[in-house]
Amino acid sequence: MRCYVFPGQGTQKKGMGRSLFGRFPDLRRRADRVLGYPIEELCLENPQRRLSETVYAQPAIYVVNALHWSAAQEDLPPADFLAGHSLGEYSALLAAGAFDFETGLTLVRRRAELMGQVSGGAMAAVVGVSEQIVEETLKQHDATGVVIANYNAPEQFVLSGSHEELARIKPVFEKVEGVRAFVPVRVSGPFHASAMAPAAERFRSVLASVDVGGLRTPVISNVTGRPFGPDAQEVRALLAEQIARPVRWTDGIRYLRDAGVSVFTELGESKVLTSLIDRITTAQEPTPDPRRDLIERIKREILQPEIGDEALGFDEDASFRRLGLNSIIYVRLARRAGTVLGIPVKPDVIFQHRSCAALADYLLTRDDIAQAIARAAPPEAPPAPLREYQDERVTALLHGCANGTLSVDRTIEAIRALA
């Protein structure tokens, strides 16, 4: 499955959207009408360094993200999920059909105005250590006014707090073993922290009058790390809360991975999220678990051929007696285990260790059997080769489907169009 992700504030830069404004002039004109100033000039020229100001940066990023989304609709296959980091969440909701472009831009502009009114704070990124170490360091040095505002990756966090407190703890973190960087984030306030609560409440009243439609594609909420529900009131509530609550980006990406997403494509002027996702997915790779693997092999390769698919859902700690096995079946299971493991296994072994877990535990204590298990572990199957067709266009389409560039439906439609 595929997910498109949209970056948020901090990714703005002079020249953003240069290759796309000319391609989608109608979107530029609509943005100019809502904002009352030329968005293309702001993005390409950055007059008076306005992109460093929240009130200008957020609308600019939203518009440029929308340009990239417009291009993606023409050039890329559809998404199964959408997600955006902080401000980028509005781009994801736009792509999902929650509101139209103008409504989203109006919300973003008002959000930026309210957030820009909160002064006296800043944000800084800590890279290289775990959440526990970050929390312990803050606690040990009485940095009670500094909180984790973004959970960006297992070893990357963004802190929110006052300028003074962040300046005080900077040298502290730089001396912590493992910390690779402590750097300021390009925002104008202590976002996603309790200092933003007044802005969040005022924004809640703005959202109350906005019509939020049903989502055509699931969107991950920054507040929960889970998809928004179908209730429009819930969407409004979470958008308001997001201003003063931490961004749980790591939780959201882990949810998507568990849901089966294997392809993440960042739409915007940054590859920051791509880097974060790589760190999250690398850290999420499961460590080898010989016991778990052996239990699954016992179910799949020894039990299932004898008793059927019931074996796959059978409780690993439940006794084989619950399956109604007789002595003949025990003998057959022993023979099959011997075939699978490549060494003789006596029926008594099965009879005395009458659950998948107990049998696995016993087998792993036997050096000869453990070595046989390692030898017998099935190699990872290579991907099935695609049949080569004489028509190179068909071959290209099939390869695109195989590597995830094209969906199955689009591949079928494209092949039919060639007929």
Predicted regions and their residues:
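Flexible, low-complexity inter-domain linkers and amphipathic docking helices that mediate domain-domain
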Residues: A283-A419
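Phosphate/ATP-binding catalytic cores across multiple sugar-kinase/actin-like superfamilies
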Residues: V64-D75, Q242-A259
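Alpha/beta catalytic cores of group-transfer enzymes, especially the acyltransferase/condensing modules
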Residues: Q9-T11, R33-Y37, S70, A95-A244
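Active-site catalytic pocket residues across diverse enzymes, especially alpha/beta-hydrolases
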Residues: L20, A98-F99, H141, F173, ...
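FabD-like malonyl-/acyl-CoA
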Residues: M1-E136, A181, V185, V263-T282, ...
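Flexible, low-complexity linker/boundary loops enriched in proline and small hydrophobic residues
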Residues: V5-P7, R202-R204, I220-P227, A232-I253, ...
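Conserved small-residue
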Residues: F6-G8, A31, N65, G88, ...
